[in-house]
Amino acid sequence: MKSTLLAAVLLASLSAPVPDGRAPEGAERVRAELTIAQLQYDGGGDWYANPSGLPNLLAEIRKRTGLRVAERPVQIRLTDPNLYNYPYLYLTGHGNIRFTPEELQVLRQYLANGGFLHADDNYGLDESFRREMRRVFPDQELVELPADHPVYHAFYEFPDGLPKIHQHDGKPAQGFGLFQEGRLVVFYSYESDLGNGWEDADRYDNPPETREKAFRMGVNLFLYALAQVTP
């Protein structure tokens, strides 16, 4: 399973960032370093939360898979013409998100054309994120993914689904998704706070085994998303 998935990701990383190549007119299509794009948004929420998390995750991806990924993520807005060079978009924060009509249209097109969004609830994100997803896809609702979904078994095994990393309200961790033509385009990690577990070891009081679960799930998400990019 691991070797097959890595082969798919290696092939995908050599191809165009958007699988079917239908980037909108005016969008720049250049060879970009393989990395995670962190979404900047308006509305008052701290999109920049957990600043050491993504660099640490990228380091673990390099170490565990051998993929040549960048040392740091890029920070990007939905209106940036380089958006289509990054098939993995990451969103986090504690507060409110608000997209403009233009951003909604871009995100809808980005996801329909092969992009992947991972939204990581850093506590306090849930209400506004669900609202904005209804604006992106008015005819869809986020659905909870079963524990046998491939994202939980892409590289590491999570037989019980999304791991619980930070306690917050003590609610169980849940993974939700939105689909386009059978493809998972949005993964929403709720009441898990993976980014908390990716942060520097001295930042929070997470034990090593909890941080390990967070990194493993992060590797799964990255590889799963990139394996969907086909030449």
Residue ranges and their predicted role:
Residues P17-Y88, T92-G95, V185, D193-L194, ...:
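Aromatic-Pro/Gly-enriched surface loop or interdomain linker
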Residues T4-S13:
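Sec-dependent N-terminal signal peptides
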Residues L67-R77, A119-N122, Q140-D148, P231:
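Surface-exposed patches in mature extracellular/periplasmic domains of secreted proteins
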Residues P51-L58, L104, R108, D126, ...:
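Extracytoplasmic/secreted envelope proteins and their assembly/folding machinery
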Residues G44, D126-D202, T210-F215, V219:
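An acidic, glycine-rich "communication" segment
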Residues E71-L78, T100-V106, G170-Q174:
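Alpha-helical scaffolding within the catalytic cores
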Residues I36, Y88-E127:
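Short alpha-beta junction capping motif
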